[in-house]
Amino acid sequence: MDARISPLAAFAALALLLPFAREATAQACSFTAAGDRFAQLLVDAGLPGGAILVGDRQGLLHERYFGTYGPNTVVPIASGSKLVSGARILQLIDQGVIDPAAPVSTVLPQFTGEKGTMNVLQMFSHTSGYGDDSGDPLLFDRTISLEQAVDEIACCRPLTAGYTVGGQFSYGGVSMHIGGRLAEVASGEDWQAGWQAHLGAPLGITTIDWQAFGATTNYSIAGGARSNLRDAGRLMHLLVNDGRSNNRRLLSPATVARLTVDAAAGLPVASAPPGVTPPVMYGVGSWLDGLGGNLRRPQFVHSLGAFGFFPWVDFGRRLFGVFMVRGSGGINAQTIPAYRDMLTAIETELAGGSCDWIERFDEIFVDDVETL
């Protein structure tokens, strides 16, 4: 009888033993400093509640609700929608449904002239030639469809004065609106239904939709989504785990890596939200920094929303999280310094020793195991 053990069998045996070894020496971290700072933020901002979620590739490390918030609390996530929408665009690129370099006119021929030359990556990185237009009423008109809104943009919304396609970074919402309609036409599916079928359902997500401000089919791609804490966390886990979650591969690692490519590098900054400080770094629907251009976290991506909702992924540390509040306009003058402090406190606690998971994910976490 051959007593040799194959490498795959040895790995499987080790995978069974490792959780028990960790559980014997580790316990859940309390993240007290981060929680205290968050609680102070809620008091200072006069907010009724909030929530914190922190995890890594293998499971959840911390989940806590404050005040009136609980597991069923759903809030508008404002610009947190950009990363949520960007994940669907990346999936369609991965599947070959969207060519990331193709001009928009190849799918939406109503876009002509220079604005017909922008591509979907430019649309989702604020480098398309549109921008400084987050408050355009067309994006939030619930009486029309996404198709009608984008036809109006093609007809009657020129590029922002003085802008060129690919010539500057200018934060806004119109270009992502166009990208959402491009996705509908290329895939043959309604935006919201497609997202829910191909990302939401496989991940067990039930609360994410684009109805944050009332029933509509004019989905505000860049700012109209809503979510509870756990569902946003499920999507962040997919990203931190290189496109695999809930025992499903939904994105390739190479496609997820696009999130950390700085599309704004070398471009003049024509407009940016309040509180954003140089250097401005932006990927696909997400900022590339640790809040305020903190270069200690060059592989940190986030999509902070105007109401304070903060989904984030730290690819360098293999962590993800969601800080959940629902404030009013201007709240981020208070959330940004608080979130900086919370991230530092979380990193410090994790660096101090092993933190056990409060919930394990049923996954295999070994690079390239799928190629064996």
Regions found by a protein language model. Give the residues of each.
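Ser/Thr-rich, Pro/Gly/Ala-heavy low-complexity intrinsically disordered linkers and tails
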Residues: 361-372
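Catalytic loop of the DD-peptidase/beta-lactamase superfamily, centered on the K-T-G motif
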Residues: 27-64, 72, 184-189, 197, ...
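Bacterial N-terminal signal peptides
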Residues: 9-19
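Active-site-proximal loop and beta-strand segments within enzyme catalytic domains
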Residues: 45-48, 69-172, 189
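Catalytic-site signature segments of enzymes, centered on catalytic residues
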Residues: 65, 74, 134-233
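Short, well-structured active-site flanking segments
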Residues: 91-109, 186-211, 247-253
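Active-site SXXK
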Residues: 38-39, 52, 58, 75-101, ...
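Sec/Tat signal peptide C-region and signal peptidase I cleavage site
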Residues: 20-26
